[in-house]
Amino acid sequence: MLRVAGRRLFSVSQRSSTATSFVLSRDHTLSDGGNSSSASRSVPSADLSSFNSYHRSVIRGFASQVITQGNEIGFGSEVPATVEAVKTPNSKIVYDDHNHERYPPGDPSKRAFAYFVLSGGRFVYASVLRLLVLKLIVSMSASKDVLALASLEVDLGSIEPGTTVTVKWRGKPVFIRRRTEDDIKLANSVDVGSLRDPQEDSVRVKNPEWLIVVGVCTHLGCIPLPNAGDYGGWFCPCHGSHYDISGRIRKGPAPYNLEVPTYSFLEENKLLIG
């Protein structure tokens, strides 16, 4: 548009100079022809008026042409110029691609390689994630050393009748008592209904001769003393809880009987705790 305006202005200046030279030459010719002074003055004034009208018409034509040119590219319409340029492209519209870097389209033959790389990366990622999950699960499971410590094998051949042996299992003391016939009769003669934590003696033992209980008081976790108390079983010196020969609470603040751990007899004189 600026180029068009420059051309119009240049053409107007040329026309103006041509008209001016024409009027001056006309005036000079008339004055040299020997006519009167009034005639020589009237001719240039008429020529000047015609020149002014011609000059105004040229300017009006230039303005109308500029407006028409503006309307052609969409400045005079309600639609924005950019939208109009997109709808009606022409050779006069030039786009500046300096700030818009254009990349050439990709080669279709390389798509297979790109898909292969992406798929392979996903499989590798899934494999690594699977290994991490498996390692986490394995680390959370107990090892063989821990499982070995979780169970304890005890030889019962050296325990005399009427005595109690204390072993350590999972950081806790375990009482193993070999009961006599009198101890068994005394444990079965108790009225279960009168107990704070009622349990039959047959429920607490697998072999009536052997009683296996965890040596921790159910009150506050103290270790009771064997072969002590008012009932011939265990006595807790911390707060005065009394347990009978079956490990049941008979007196004192303890709310429950002594805990019976999981155990089994491997052989006649072999005991496995845990």
From Swiss-Prot:
Gene3D superfamilies: Rieske [2Fe-2S] iron-sulphur domain (2.102.10.10). The chain crosses the membrane at residues 112-134. It is an enzyme of class 7 (translocase). It is found in: Mitochondrion inner membrane. Binds 1 [2Fe-2S] cluster per subunit. Binds to divalent metal cations. CDD domains: Rieske_cytochrome_bc1. InterPro entries: Rieske_2Fe-2S, Rieske_2Fe-2S_sf, Rieske_Fe-S_prot, Rieske_Fe-S_prot_C, Rieske_TM, Ubiquinol_cyt_c_Rdtase_Fe-S-su. It is a single-pass membrane protein. Its main location: mitochondrion. Belongs to the Rieske iron-sulfur protein family. NCBIfam families: Rieske_proteo. The Rieske protein is a high potential 2Fe-2S protein. Component of the ubiquinol-cytochrome c oxidoreductase (cytochrome b-c1 complex, complex III, CIII), a multisubunit enzyme composed of 10 subunits. The complex is composed of 3 respiratory subunits cytochrome b (MT-CYB), cytochrome c1 (CYC1-1 or CYC1-2) and Rieske protein (UCR1-1 or UCR1-2), 2 core protein subunits MPPalpha1 (or MPPalpha2) and MPPB, and 5 low-molecular weight protein subunits QCR7-1 (or QCR7-2), UCRQ-1 (or UCRQ-2), QCR9, UCRY and probably QCR6-1 (or QCR6-2). This is Cytochrome b-c1 complex subunit Rieske-2, mitochondrial. It comes from Arabidopsis thaliana (Mouse-ear cress).
